[in-house]
Design a protein with these regions (language model features):
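Flexible, glycine/charged-enriched surface loops at secondary-structure junctions
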Residues: 6, 52, 217-220
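Short glycine/serine/threonine-rich phosphate/pyrophosphate-binding segments
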Residues: 17-22, 31-38, 98, 149-150
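Phosphate-coordination loops involved in phosphoryl transfer and adenosine-cofactor binding
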Residues: 5-7, 135
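N-terminal nucleotide-binding beta1-loop-alpha1 segment
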Residues: 7-17
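Short, small-residue-biased leader/transition segments that mark boundaries at the very start
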Residues: 1-2
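Glycine-rich phosphate/adenylate-binding loop
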Residues: 133, 149-220
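Glycine- and acidic-residue-enriched helix-capping/strand-helix junction motifs
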Residues: 21-33, 113-121
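Glycine-rich phosphate/dinucleotide-binding loop and adjoining beta-alpha-beta core of small-molecule
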Residues: 37, 43, 48-176
Length: 220
């Protein structure tokens, strides 16, 4: 097994839902499959795994601790509680960039839908990065629609302060909801590996191995 006894891994997965009213919400197309694959592989390699789950496909992860976190605020609150207890974070969740300034108590009428006021959600990964300890490992994920997605991924890895970042080009809805992924994995030295339509478990295995090795560097 890659992880020594007692090593703890935190995984966020799925797409957050930001309530507009009792019926509607702001969401995205994330299925959570990548995060679930990572959680499965980390469990298989001996880690104690906690999953902060937003909206995902149905799943079963025997041995994992599952905490529902449907909104960005709920996920942020749990991240602040759980991060100090874990050796690594895989931030695979697709967190909404914005939320309604106010959740309406009754269903918004159609003629009022053009006047919804939004406010930015906090940047969860950047916030965690600023407060992590030196021996915690952070893995970020980015979805871009620009052909320069690798360049944008490099900039994001540096600005977020993460050890590893996987960036995908999701132009046209690619990757979301699929069992396969295409993208680029990078660390502080640049591109580690490029993936072209591989099963998400292939990426999960590579990421879990890289993180386990990084934890080993920190703790010997």
């Amino acid at each position: 097994m890659l992880f020594r006894s007692g090593r703890k891994v935190l995984v966020t997965t799925g797409g957050t839902q930001e309530a507009l009213d009792p019926v509607r919400y702001i969401g995205n197309r994330s299925s959570g499959r990548q995060g679930l694959a990572i959680a499965y592989e980390a469990l298989r390699e001996g880690a104690e795994v906690t999953v902060l789950a937003a909206d995902t496909v149905p799943f079963s992860l025997e041995g994992a601790r599952i905490i529902p976190t449907m909104s960005a605020d709920a996920m942020f609150a749990e991240l602040k509680r759980e991060m100090p207890l874990h050796d690594a974070l895989f931030m695979t969740a697709a967190v909404a960039d914005a939320k309604p300034r106010e959740i309406q108590r009754s269903k918004i009428k159609k003629n009022n839908l053009d006047s919804i006021n939004l406010v930015p959600n906090p940047d969860l990964l950047s916030s965690v990065s600023k407060t992590r300890t030196r021996d915690q490992v952070l893995v970020g994920f980015a979805a871009e629609t620009d052909e320069r997605y690798e360049e944008l991924g490099k900039q994001k890895r540096e600005s977020k302060g993460v050890d590893f970042l996987y960036v995908t080009n999701v132009q046209g809805g690619a990757v979301f909801g699929e069992n396969e992924t295409s993208g680029t994995l990078m660390d502080k030295n640049g591109v580690m590996k490029r993936y072209d339509k591989v099963d998400k478990f292939v990426l999960a295995k590579d990421l879990v191995k890289a993180v386990a090795e990084k934890i080993g560097e920190f703790h010997g």
